[in-house]
Design a protein with these regions (language model features):
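Bacterial Sec-dependent N-terminal signal peptides
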Residues: 1-23
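Inter-helical turn/loop segments and adjacent helix faces that build the functional surface
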Residues: 69, 170-181, 240-252, 305-313
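Alpha-helical scaffold segments in carbohydrate-active enzymes
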Residues: 32, 61-64, 84, 129, ...
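CBM-like carbohydrate-recognition segments
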Residues: 24-56, 68-78, 84-104, 108, ...
Length: 637
């Protein structure tokens, strides 16, 4: 109980800090970024800027905003930015694989987003090029990636962020399970060589050959702990864990590394300001200063680690205090009504020409600027995490389970060539998926889960919410799993004990309804096997519905709901939304539990992610409204 109270207190404390003039700081900073860099990181008119990791940091922040707001301008910006470089055949302009520069892999994550959302092969082909680079990247003797071909035998902390999150996400896409050993080893090698046992911090770089002038002749390590290098490393860990298999034997090692990293980060957080210094362990060093990008990265890593349960809730203190310090020290309003980020060191590295010796004095010589892309991107990521942390958490400690037994379609994934489950799945980011609706639950503190087996008392016991959508016909699946009396009884007993059942059917011809409705009939809700709200082409108003004074949909006022099965009610079932004589949405209390039913899958990405519907339709608000209501009902047991 104390832990939950602590989490809530931190979230509330963060809430007023995230706003300036009524608008979220994450959105204001994104507006600044999209204005400064309209389609690439071109800062001088007529001058082409090369494929650069800086842009990838910004685009990941923009993607985080798109996922939280469903505002299409964010997706359009990501696509426009990458299309500036990616040709129709997947060639990446200005990219040279033969450089074996691991920085160049970073933007692959934005390409993966575009492929997953659009299915366009040019993005997949570009990703395959970056994947090929990783497979051919020169390595240390034990297998660690060189940072660049021009920096032989060297591993830098920066490189873990530039390469590993893409490596993990692409490996997950193509089902290359063996790759995860290699991914984990990159972090293990880096920590084994670069972690200082006394401070817990990691040195910026390690030279296996010990030939560099900056390298210690015994250890091969650079002399100092650079803030942003540790920031890259921390962000890499939380991003890789998103795709690292839950049952992989090396996942515990990554979690342990993350927790050791956050412990060191917490130790060197300035207690007065909540910020971190350019050189982390020399708070009293002459000329040392609080640095913005590192501070943003640590806030992002800590907040996300806690949200995703990669680290204990106590680490949220790092993020809450750091975010307050960032706003006080580095955020300033600009003439456009948005904000700027001050205080980011433009660059720091090791070796090269002119030679960078890694000394304390060197790190303090590099220029500090306003609105550096790396800092801006890290701030958007950090602010987005804090925006999520500030949301109410009715789902805390609850599990929302999505059925994949009655809805069990498969297709051949082009990237892997393997059969993959699809259509209304949490992980799908294309039109067919529930990615955005899944966020509606996780942002509110719930865990999401998928049940591939038939429902039983045992496998439903761990779920607070059970969602069944669009039961298969023989047209969709060779051997459909139909609803049976034993399943009806099992589910009904689970609801009676306090479960929340969400039934999202479909209209006649697009779902199996004859057997499926034996389940809903148990609760007094019958799917009529008809088809209402037929829509022709892009005449979206044909599917428009107005919502007023609705106990479930408290913020959505106009929604799009097409080709639906209407409902007939009996017993205690109540209509939630009607039009004319037709019942479109219904609910019923059953024992200690609740049932919600509508004759359409409704909240799949196509109609909630902002890319298709006109802006006056509020399906994303409706999806959030339903998620909040469902989670609230699950607490009323």
């Amino acid at each position: 109980m104390k832990k939950n109270i602590l989490n809530i207190a931190f979230a509330i404390a963060a809430l007023p800090l995230t706003h300036v003039s009524g608008q979220l700081l994450s959105e204001k900073m994104a507006s600044t970024a999209m204005s400064l860099w309209k389609d690439s990181l071109v800062t001088t008119p007529g001058r082409m800027v090369k494929w650069s990791y800086d842009q990838g940091v910004i685009l990941e922040g923009i993607d985080a905003l798109w996922q939280r707001t469903a505002d299409r301008k964010y997706f359009d910006y990501i696509k426009r930015s990458m299309d500036h470089y990616v040709e129709g055949d997947g060639t990446i302009r200005t990219y040279k694989q033969e450089d074996y520069n691991i920085d160049n892999v970073k933007n692959g994550r934005s390409l993966l987003t575009l492929y997953k959302v659009t299915g366009q092969q040019k993005y997949l082909k570009a990703c395959a090029t970056l994947w090929q680079q990783l497979h051919n990247q020169p390595r240390t003797r034990e297998g660690g990636f060189w940072h660049k071909k021009i920096y032989p035998y060297q591993m830098w902390l920066d490189g873990l962020y530039m390469g590993e999150p893409f490596y993990a996400e692409y490996a997950d896409l193509i089902k290359d399970d063996k790759a995860f050993d290699d991914i984990a080893n990159q972090f293990i090698y880096m920590e084994n060589h670069a972690r200082d046992k006394k401070t817990g911090l990691l040195y910026h770089g390690w030279d296996e050959s010990k030939e560099q002038k900056w390298a210690d002749k015994t250890t091969g390590l650079s002399p100092n702990f650079w803030g942003r290098a540790m920031g890259w490393y921390a962000m890499a860990l939380v991003d890789v864990l998103d795709y690292f298999p839950a049952g992989h034997p090396k996942r515990p090692a990554l979690l342990a590394i993350l927790n050791r990293t956050l412990t060191a980060v917490q130790k060197y957080q300035d207690p007065a300001s909540g910020l971190w210094f350019q050189v982390l362990d020399k708070a009293d060093g002459k000329g040392n200063y609080h640095e913005a990008s590192a501070s943003c990265m640590f806030v992002y890593a800590a907040a996300k680690a806690v949200r995703k349960e990669y680290a204990p809730a106590a680490f949220f203190r790092i993020a809450q205090k750091g975010y307050a310090g960032i706003q006080k020290a580095f955020i300033e309003p600009n003439d456009s009504g948005w904000v700027n980020l001050k205080g980011t060191v433009s660059v720091a590295g090791l070796g090269g020409n002119p030679y960078r010796d890694g000394s304390y004095e060197y790190y303090l010589r590099e220029k500090v600027i306003t609105n550096d892309a790396k800092g801006v991107g890290a701030f958007i990521l950090a602010a987005s995490e804090m925006d999520i942390a500030a949301m109410a958490k009715p789902g805390k400690g609850k599990t929302v389970t999505l059925d994949s037994y009655f809805n069990n379609e498969f297709y051949t994934e082009p990237a892997s060539g393997a059969q993959a489950s699809y259509h209304y799945k949490w992980e799908e980011r294309d039109n067919n998926g529930f990615h955005f609706w899944g966020n509606s639950y996780t942002y509110r503190g719930a865990r999401i889960n998928t049940l591939y087996d038939a429902p039983t008392s045992a496998n439903l016991k761990k779920s607070d919410v059970y969602i069944i959508v669009d039961a298969d016909t023989e047209k969709e699946t060779k051997n459909p799993n139909y609803m049976k009396p034993e399943y009806v009884n099992t589910i009904a007993e689970w609801v009676k004990a306090g479960g929340v059942l969400v039934l999202l059917a479909n209209d006649a011809g697009n779902a199996e309804l004859k057997q499926f409705t034996t389940l809903s009939d148990k609760f007094g809700i019958h799917f009529n096997e008809d088809s209402r709200n037929k829509v022709t082409g892009s005449q979206f108003e044909m599917g428009a519905l107005k919502i007023e004074n609705n106990p479930i949909f408290k913020t959505a006022r106009k929604v799009y709901l097409k080709e639906i099965s209407t409902l007939t009610l009996s017993g205690n079932a109540k209509a939630n939304l009607t039009e004319g004589k037709d019942v479109l949405i219904a609910t019923v209390k059953y024992g200690k539990g609740t049932v919600f039913a509508v004759g359409d899958p409704w909240f799949y990405n196509e109609y909630v992610d902002g890319r298709k519907l006109p802006a006056d339709f509020e399906n994303y608000k409706a999806a959030n409204d339903l998620a909040a209501w469902v989670l609230e009902q699950s607490s009323k047991k």
